[in-house]
């Protein structure tokens, strides 16, 4: 390897060199530097820990032709300087072999350079668990003394993304992402409870408090009550609300709605923007600068599809109200789909907040319940009907019966059939908004803040035998 090729090893240098090598009409280069640290435990003891590092480079070439602009995308992991030219040429060949891209737009320009673009990537390490790990060990001791077993994992990831384009963009974003999932089980495995947390640095995660919460829930489960399927007043905790609202956001395509394919389509044509979806003054929004839930302030698109476009790379992501005071305000669009539909440009953000409810905690909402069900979380959520956004899924790790303001026991699990849009319309109370980890979607979406919701007639369509 020559000194010239050996030099370009820092992510920003890799990006610059790839852009220099490009012979296409347009080029976008995305370098993702990822580091992770993790802990796993079972039966009140740590079992494994690890640290990983990785680099992925994505080159997007655009080629102008008589019939339009084509794009080619090639991504590779662990790319070295010597492999750059072959990667760039592969993207160019893919573009020349493709037809005109439907989503073609001029590459984004005019966005201010990130001042830290030339700095080395941020990294995580096992040091992120310096305070958390000893506290977890103390939780193991308490659980052991209390006759319960703790299982779970903690993962921390830090991704530094460098984005450069032939139109002059030089952008960078560092994204920390931490998740904790903790299960408590009785020694005979007949009772199980779960808690999860999303965090940027594990400094705000308290294993002792989580263990105490799970101990209470295992105590509730000592009394077992069988209930049939049916509609029940139900308290959905923030994690369950997050899973439902995230799926709703993923289904909020402006183009699909305009073309009559979704729950947000207006009968006879157009969209339901401006329609009241909830009598509660709820606001569903995304904001890349939301404290504690910060996310990329510009579009990072490694491929085109759905409501993202490689041509939009670097486009600023603005604070957006999807629902404002109960009214549908925006649907997700690219620049291309916005031009097709006449809707505003509204790229989807990587966080989601539902607020506008009361200041009552979930515990206070339980105390105000005559008879109803308290859920722990939802699992295995799948779409049944896009026209109504009817979803099906399972409850898991604890469904509790509340009578006269107190939990009186654990009931069986259920399969549910519900639409998140319908739930917003029927919810009678929203509690205090708090950061939460969506259990079903935690591999893809972790930055959420939600209230608990009270739904008077949640549809438990059948009984499930799972724990």
Regions found by a protein language model. Name each.
Residues 269-467:
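Dual-mode signal for accessory low-complexity, basic/Gly-rich regions
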């Amino acid at each position: 390897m020559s000194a010239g090729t050996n030099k370009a090893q820092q992510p920003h240098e890799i990006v610059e060199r790839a852009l220099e090598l490009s012979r296409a009409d347009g080029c976008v280069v995305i370098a993702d530097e990822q580091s992770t640290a993790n802990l796993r435990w079972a039966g009140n003891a740590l079992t494994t820990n690890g640290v990983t590092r990785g680099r992925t480079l994505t080159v997007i070439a655009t080629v102008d032709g008589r019939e339009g602009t084509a794009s080619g995308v090639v991504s590779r992991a662990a790319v070295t300087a010597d492999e750059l030219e072959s990667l760039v040429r592969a993207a160019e060949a893919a573009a020349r072999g493709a037809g005109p891209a439907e989503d073609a737009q001029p590459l984004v320009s005019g966005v201010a350079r990130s001042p830290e673009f030339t700095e080395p990537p941020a990294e995580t390490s096992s040091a992120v668990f310096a305070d958390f790990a000893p506290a977890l060990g103390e939780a193991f001791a308490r659980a052991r003394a209390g006759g319960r077993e703790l299982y779970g994992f903690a993962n921390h990831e830090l991704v530094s993304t460098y984005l450069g384009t032939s139109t002059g963009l030089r952008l960078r974003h560092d994204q920390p992402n931490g998740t904790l999932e903790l299960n408590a089980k009785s020694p005979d495995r007949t009772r199980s409870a779960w808690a999860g947390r999303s965090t940027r640095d594990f400094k705000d995660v308290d294993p002792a408090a989580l263990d105490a919460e799970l101990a209470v829930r295992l105590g509730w489960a000592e009394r077992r009550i069988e209930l049939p399927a049916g509609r029940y007043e139900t308290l959905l905790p923030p994690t369950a609300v997050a899973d439902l609202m995230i799926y709703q956001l993923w289904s909020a395509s402006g183009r699909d709605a305009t073309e009559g394919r979704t729950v947000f389509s207006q009968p006879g044509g157009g969209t339901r923007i401006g329609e009241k979806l909830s009598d509660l003054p709820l606001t569903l929004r995304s904001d890349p600068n939301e404290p504690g839930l910060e996310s990329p302030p510009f579009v990072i698109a490694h491929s085109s599809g759905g409501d993202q476009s490689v041509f939009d790379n670097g486009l600023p992501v603005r604070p957006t109200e999807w629902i404002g005071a109960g009214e549908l305000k925006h649907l997700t669009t690219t620049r291309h789909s916005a031009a097709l539909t006449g809707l505003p440009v509204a790229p989807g953000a990587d966080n989601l907040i539902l607020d506008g409810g009361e200041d009552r905690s979930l515990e206070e909402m339980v105390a105000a319940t005559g008879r109803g069900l308290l859920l722990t979380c939802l699992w295995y959520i799948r779409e049944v009907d896009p026209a109504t956004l009817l979803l099906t899924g399972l409850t898991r790790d604890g469904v509790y019966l509340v009578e006269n303001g107190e939990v009186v026991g654990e009931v069986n699990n259920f399969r549910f059939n519900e639409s998140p849009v319908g739930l917003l319309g029927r919810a009678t109370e929203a509690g205090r908004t708090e950061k939460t980890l969506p259990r079903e979607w935690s591999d893809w979406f972790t930055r959420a803040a939600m209230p608990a919701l009270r739904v008077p007639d949640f549809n438990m369509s059948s009984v499930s035998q799972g724990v």
